[in-house]
Regions:
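Single-pass alpha-helical transmembrane signal-anchor segments
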Residues: 1-17
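TPR-adjacent "capping" and linker segments in tetratricopeptide-repeat scaffold/adaptor proteins
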Residues: 12-24, 89
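A short, mixed-charge helix-start or loop-turn motif at secondary-structure junctions
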Residues: 13, 49, 84-85
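Residue-level signature for tetratricopeptide repeat
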Residues: 14, 26-29, 33-37, 65-69, ...
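Alpha-helix N-cap/N′ positions at the starts of helices
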Residues: 19-26, 42, 98
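Short extracytoplasmic
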Residues: 26-61
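Soluble extracytoplasmic domains of inner/organellar membrane proteins
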Residues: 54-59, 63-64, 70-139
Length: 139
């Protein structure tokens, strides 16, 4: 009976996790539709909600869209988004990509020194992005 209870709890957990993922994916699609119809404020709000949901896949996509479409002007908010996503990513390669984006964002917008420090860390680590970081540091 204990094993049956465990299986039921595990099944419930997986179903709940899948439902949450589906809701976030629907929200991501909705944000994209708002963006396509040029309703930037509604799309930004939905992308922020996705980031705060802490879904590793969709939060990263939402941040990428916010950065690419320049939906958020407040750099402190953008840095907060980076912090949230840094805490939920557990693969080194994804974390390196996020750090590269953060470095480029900082160099472009607010804090060149910190951006270059992040690039130096990527260069000095065993990152697959080492050559890209070196190339940017040369310029």
């Amino acid at each position: 009976t204990l094993s049956i209870l465990f299986i039921i709890i595990l099944s419930f957990y997986e179903i709940n996790k899948q439902k949450k993922n589906n809701l976030i994916s629907e929200k991501y699609i909705e944000a994209g539709l708002y963006l396509a119809s040029n309703d930037l404020e509604k799309s930004k709000i939905l992308y922020e909600q996705i980031i705060f949901s802490k879904n590793p896949f969709y939060s990263t996509l939402a941040l990428n869209t916010i950065l690419e479409k320049d939906l958020e002007k407040d750099s402190s908010k953008i840095l907060k988004y980076f912090e949230i996503i840094e805490k939920i990513i557990n693969q080194k390669e994804q974390n390196d990509i996020l750090n590269l984006k953060k470095a480029l964002y900082l160099i472009k917008n607010s804090d060149e020194q910190t951006g270059y420090e992040i690039l130096k860390e990527l260069r000095d680590s065993n990152s697959s992005l080492k050559s890209i970081a070196e190339e940017i540091l040369k310029d």
